């Protein structure tokens, strides 16, 4: 589903991604973790070309993201992306946020888009908030609407860029529960997160990044209990004992 080959990304003289090669198979849940500034968010944002790469190739759903002539809108339509900051349209209701793209990009008729959106809002536990505007929703509710909106395009792949980082701690669980449900349903997902308990419970594989490189790839049990790379070992020690 996702193939990343020899990808490099620069910000001026700063080498943000260094020769990254990785793949995510259909139905696989891959969690990307690491310290701040390690390149996690940059990597996931290159997958749907929110960030452009300097070299290498990225292929999603059989489409080369960086090939000349790639229709970027059509390419992105096959990838759901959930941001840190929700990015809902403030002047649209929860329902309207979930119907806009299917109607404009997929040509869905309004009644069909409405029916689909209501089903998705129900799936994330927010059918009762269909007519609410984002300003009337909590952060956790806004992020669940954002997930429903991403699902409205029926993407085979979902990307999450630290989806709980902007939430109050008590709101985190409701968003992670929705994501866990997607994993159970077989959605292909690539997730950047600091929620290590979630990664342990849901991921098929964990990628650990630091300084623009993937330093370790492992099953969750191996990564959390038997990390091989010294930097991963230090990272896990630090998050387990933050005041020592």
Locate the predicted segments by residue.
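C-terminal boundary and immediately downstream tail of ABC-type ATPase nucleotide-binding domains
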Residues: 217, 221-244
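ABC family nucleotide-binding domain
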Residues: 1-220
């Amino acid at each position: 589903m996702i193939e990343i080959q020899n990808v490099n990304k620069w910000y001026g003289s700063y080498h943000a991604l260094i020769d990254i090669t990785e793949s995510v198979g259909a139905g696989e849940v891959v969690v990307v973790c690491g310290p701040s500034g390690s390149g996690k968010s940059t990597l996931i944002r290159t997958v749907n070309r929110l960030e452009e790469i300097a070299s290498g190739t990225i292929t999603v759903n059989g489409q080369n993201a960086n090939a000349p002539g790639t229709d970027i809108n059509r390419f992105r339509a096959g990838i759901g992306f959930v941001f840190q900051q929700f990015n809902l349209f403030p002047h649209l209701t929860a329902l309207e946020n979930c119907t806009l793209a299917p109607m404009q990009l997929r040509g869905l008729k309004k009644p069909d888009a409405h029916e689909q959106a209501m089903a998705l809002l129900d799936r994330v536990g927010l059918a009762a908030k269909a007519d609410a505007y984002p300003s009337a929703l909590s952060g956790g509710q806004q992020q669940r609407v954002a997930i429903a909106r991403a699902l409205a395009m029926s993407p085979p792949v979902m990307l999450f860029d630290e989806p709980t980082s902007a939430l109050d701690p008590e709101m985190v669980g409701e968003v992670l529960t929705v994501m866990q449900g997607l994993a159970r349903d077989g959605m292909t997902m690539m997730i950047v997160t600091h929620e290590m308990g979630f990664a342990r419970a849901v991921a098929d594989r964990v990628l650990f990044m630091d300084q623009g490189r993937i330093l370790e790839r492992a099953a969750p049990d191996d990564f959390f209990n038997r990390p091989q790379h010294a930097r991963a070992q230090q990272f896990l020690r630090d998050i387990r004992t933050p005041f020592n």
